[in-house]
Regions:
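Bacterial N-terminal signal peptides
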Residues: 2-12
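N-terminal, polar/Ser/Thr-rich
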Residues: 7, 18-69
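Extended, low-hydrophobicity, Ser/Thr/Pro/Gly-biased non-transmembrane segments
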Residues: 110-138, 148, 154-168, 178-285
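Hydrophobic helix-coil surface modules that form long, contiguous segments used
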Residues: 205, 209-218, 225-380, 409, ...
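Active-site His/Glu-centered metal-binding helix of metallohydrolases
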Residues: 379, 383-388, 406, 410
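Catalytic Zn2+-binding segment of zinc metalloproteases
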Residues: 383-399
Length: 425
């Protein structure tokens, strides 16, 4: 919270006073502002976030069946001031389980129902097949039968996006809990933020995920059509097995890639100090890389996974990302991760314009004239969310205005000085 307060105070001073007159590196559409004075770069934030919820995950994709089979070990430390007598697990993909879920009922009410004419195969799900508590002595306690669905927000008993299980032995403040979870998931065919189309898979909110516990107990809501997410920081070590020859992009840094000899390859990605993990895979991506360099800052490797028909727009994607890294870094503090992955989703995938730690989806229009800010704007906006949502991890379910409001103000200000001045700010 101290880090959040420091950044918010920084907005009220540095962001109003001025910004650098240098254009972002390797950004051909960027023009240098002439009327805003340069200010010194703010120092990086000291230390990292508490690693409260840590995930070690193995997952295998079956693209023909559009399914995932996963196994994870969660190591969670109680950061609150009271004991935890139960757990909460988010199972977001159950929002697509049937038309009775709260998420789909809300989408229907607003007239934007992607499953209005869906076939049975179009739906998705997330099913926990095993839940085990690993005790300190290595023994295990099976909690599978204790896991049950809850709907604290709207009492919709058909909604299965949130589950709970009571613990026989409470987790005292400062103590740790280890859980082993096995599950299967199916991608919805038509999707919002996650799912599959053809051989393109974007995999987000895909694993059973703990809620947030504090001095008031659990903060864990059902999945709503107009809400996003909230979770603890932690360390992620994830192994994703996909067909050999398919490219993978994910949160964090790739550590290894192993051919399994059976037509599949396992990609291992690791990242600490993040509060979520998303990934994508497809055999059709083309890859481009560009380094973002700024004096006094660690280098950031920008990686772009692009649809082949959009290859001519690669530099414009990098321009948007570089503008965010430069100006947000000057105003709010440096981007703290070594990588940033930009995903260009295919036509009709409906997965564009969404942010996750160190990775986000952009979006390319059919017409992208040089005089427009597309695709630069959506890249700038989603890269900006790496600061406001990613590093300043507000509760997006209850206070979504915070990251969206500050990020929208900030990206509009960047547009007015670094891209085509099509916005009045």
């Amino acid at each position: 919270m101290a880090a959040v307060a420091a950044l918010v105070l920084h907005i009220s001073s540095t962001a109003v006073e001025g910004q650098s007159s240098q254009a972002p590196p390797k950004a051909p559409t960027v023009t240098a502002p002439q009327d805003i004075a340069a200010v010194p770069l703010p120092p990086p934030l000291a230390g990292g976030a508490p690693q409260t919820a840590n995930y070690d995950i193995d997952v295998t994709l079956d693209p023909a069946a559009r399914t995932l089979k996963g196994r994870e070990v969660i190591t969670w430390q109680n950061p609150g001031e009271i004991a935890a007598y139960s757990i909460r697990l988010h199972l977001y993909w159950n929002a697509f389980r049937n038309t009775k879920s709260t998420w789909l009922q809300q989408r229907h009410l607003i007239g934007n129902d992607p499953f209005a004419d869906a076939d049975a195969e179009d739906f998705g799900y997330s099913t926990v097949t095993k839940l085990v508590r690993i005790n300190d002595d290595g023994s295990e306690l099976d909690l599978t039968q204790a896991l049950h669905y809850i709907s604290p927000d709207d009492r919709n008993t058909d909604d299965r996006t949130l589950a709970a299980a009571d613990l026989a032995n409470a987790v005292e403040p400062g103590k740790s809990l280890r859980l082993r979870v096995e599950w299967t998931g199916k991608f919805p065919r038509n999707f919002d933020r996650t799912g599959a189309i053809g051989k393109y898979f974007f995999v987000s909110q895909w694993f059973p995920k703990l809620g947030v516990f504090d001095q008031a107990g659990w903060t864990a809501h059902q999945f709503f059509a107009n809400s996003e997410f909230y979770s603890d920081f932690g360390h992620y070590d994830v192994r994703m097995t996909v067909p050999t020859g398919w490219m993978v992009g994910a949160t964090g840094v790739e550590q290894s890639k192993a051919d399994n000899g059976n037509g599949t390859t396992t990609h291992r990605y690791v990242q600490g100090d993040v509060h979520d993990f998303a990934w994508t895979t497809s055999p059709d991506f083309i890859e481009r890389r560009q380094a973002f360099d700024q004096p006094g800052r660690p280098q950031v490797q920008m990686r772009l996974l692009l649809q082949p028909e959009h290859a001519h727009l690669a530099e414009r994607h990098f321009a948007g990302a570089a503008a965010a890294l430069k100006y947000y870094g000057e105003w709010y503090g440096a981007y703290t991760y070594p990588t940033l992955t930009i995903v260009d989703p295919p036509y009709q995938s409906e997965s564009g314009g969404m942010e996750y730690p160190t990775i986000f989806t952009a979006g390319t229009r059919w017409l992208s004239p040089a005089q427009s800010n597309d695709p630069e704007y959506v890249v700038l906006h989603e890269a900006g969310h790496q600061f406001w949502y990613g590093m300043v991890a507000n509760n997006e379910v209850e206070h979504g205005w915070l990251d969206e409001g500050i990020n929208e103000f900030s990206d509009s200000r960047v547009q007015s000085v670094a891209l085509q001045p099509n916005y009045l700010v």
